[in-house]
Regions:
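Alpha-helical transmembrane segments of multipass membrane proteins
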Residues: 39-42, 114, 156-160, 179-187, ...
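Small-residue-rich hydrophobic transmembrane alpha-helices
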Residues: 54-114, 151-170, 279-336, 340-342, ...
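Short runs within selected transmembrane alpha-helices of multi-pass transporters and secretion channels
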Residues: 75, 144-162, 170-181, 199-214, ...
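Juxtamembrane/transmembrane-helix interface segments of polytopic membrane transporters
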Residues: 34, 38, 42, 46, ...
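Helix-loop interface residues and adjacent transmembrane-helix termini in multi-pass membrane transporters
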Residues: 36-39, 48-51, 85-88, 163-164, ...
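Short alpha-helical transmembrane segments in multi-pass integral membrane proteins
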Residues: 1-24, 82-147, 191-247, 304-369, ...
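Membrane-helix interface/capping residues of multi-pass secondary transporters
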Residues: 42, 51-54, 91, 120, ...
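Transmembrane helix-bundle signature of multi-pass secondary active exporters and lipid flippases
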Residues: 28-80, 144-151, 240-307, 327-334, ...
């Protein structure tokens, strides 16, 4: 009870800037670590195995994104609800959400693994794979998929650990896995000469270590929230709330997977395996920046959700505005790197000169309006944190589905390979304009609740 009261005082009275720093830094570390697993694999594989291997690894990105989508569906949906009910001082309901989330996460993971294990080759072929690249993709997936269960648990419950008042512990748990992967990957790839399967096995072991520490936390009687056997009985109302709120980030990742599959297919048609590899490289860089913003939003989420539940709208506004400013700065820095220093970024992944040239050209175009992306992501997460699932889902789909898919179907017919690159920044620009409009309209509707979201 004392710990719960301390968390209440912290979230409702600590200066917002200091609070956002406290919650965001661990969250950023967590999301960056998740991205670094993929980046580390790509760097070591690109340098140690070759250009075809890195193109093959790019084929697995949609499948890996879907695994992350399941983690977000449960983890972010549950953590948003936990923050709100803790703001309402309802610990029992928070622990019911926690227990139901474990059952839901395990069920989704088993279904996912079964499906992709059965249809792996057909899926890779539909994603733009060729006879040169599919063997590498298949080998990586065969070894990485058994570890997906741990990845799901780690990602889902790391968010809940943060939402229940343990941001620092959540950060250290993720760092433990990242350092393990950083040590094991070069040993398995180079020293043991396991190649691409070595990268997968290293990631599996690292995620298992992180997942074990997360689970130990929630079985610890001293934790703010913990598992109770009596709460593992599924409650449909709780499941609906988790899924409805988590649906937005889930759809973002599903959309990302679908878009990546469409992009890979188009890239193979207009640019061959090199174009797929190039996109895989600079998409890894862009994903690092985006995941930094996602971590920032996860740090914002308990502050916004808790104060929304407590009726403190002024603090909710301050957290949102500050998060938006920091996100824009981060995306601008990412744009500077992609525009002025692309060679050094791409060179870290490969020494193949043709691949480097294709990647530099595409990177500069795709990330051309990157500074505006942060605001769009933060606003989408604001609606998610407030439990406004429909708005969050809509904004999630505008950037990666509603506008991008038609552009990807039209532009390449006119501009060939450049058309694929151009479609992405055009979609980002339109989606951001829609986001501004929806934020303004929502604020007008919330005036009766003393809303100050955009003032």
């Amino acid at each position: 009870m004392e710990n719960q009261n301390n968390i209440h005082r912290e979230l409702t009275s600590l200066p917002v800037g200091k609070l956002l720093w406290k919650y965001s830094v661990p969250a950023i570390v967590g999301t960056m670590v998740m991205s670094l697993y993929n980046v580390i694999d790509r760097i070591f594989i690109g340098q140690g195995v070759g250009a075809d291997a890195i193109s093959g690894l790019a084929l697995t990105f949609p499948i890996m994104s879907l695994a992350g989508a399941i983690g977000m569906l449960v983890g972010l949906g549950a953590s948003a609800r936990i923050s709100i009910v803790l703001g309402q001082n309802d610990k029992v309901k928070a622990e019911k959400i926690l227990a139901n989330s474990l059952v839901l996460s395990l069920s989704f993971a088993v279904c996912y693994l079964t499906f992709f294990s059965v249809y792996m080759d057909d899926i890779l072929r539909s994603f733009g794979g060729s006879d040169r690249t599919i063997p590498y993709a298949r080998e990586f997936l065969i070894y990485i998929m058994p570890g997906m269960l741990c990845t799901n648990l780690c990602y889902s419950f790391n968010n809940m650990m943060r939402a229940s008042g343990y941001p620092g512990k959540a950060m250290y748990t993720m760092l433990l896995g990242a350092f393990s992967n950083l040590i094991l990957a070069p040993i398995f790839i180079f020293w043991l000469d396991w190649g691409i399967k070595g990268a997968a096995i290293a990631t599996d072991i690292a995620m298992a270590i992180s997942a074990a520490f997360v689970m130990i936390h929630f079985f610890n009687p001293k934790s703010q929230l913990r598992f109770h056997r009596r709460y593992f009985k599924l409650e449909w109302g709780i499941l609906f709330n988790i899924v409805s709120i988590g649906l937005a980030p889930f759809l973002v990742n599903v959309a990302s997977s679908v878009i990546n599959a469409i992009i890979n297919t188009s890239l193979y048609r207009y640019g061959g395996d090199e174009a797929i590899g190039a996109f895989g490289i600079f998409n890894s860089y862009a994903t690092l920046v985006v995941m930094l913003i996602i971590g920032l939003c996860q740090g914002m989420q308990p502050i916004v959700g808790y104060n929304y539940g407590a009726g403190n709208y002024t603090r909710m506004k301050k957290a949102f505005v500050l998060t938006g400013i920091v996100a824009t700065i981060c995306c601008t820095v990412g744009w500077i790197g992609s525009t002025f220093f692309p060679y050094y970024i791409i060179r870290a992944f490969t020494t193949d000169t043709n691949l480097i040239d294709v990647a530099i050209h595409g990177m500069r175009i795709v990330m051309g309006v990157f500074p505006i992306v942060g605001f769009q992501i933060v606003t989408t997460n604001l609606f998610q944190s407030l439990g406004m699932a429909s708005k969050s889902i809509f904004l999630s789909l505008t950037r990666q589905v509603i506008f991008l898919i038609p552009l990807l179907l039209i532009f390449p017919r006119i501009y060939a390979l450049n058309g694929i690159w151009i479609a992405m920044p055009v979609s980002d620009t339109i989606a951001t304009a829609i986001t501004l409009l929806l934020l303004w309209r929502t604020d007008k509707k919330l005036q009766n609740k003393n809303s100050v979201i955009t003032r």
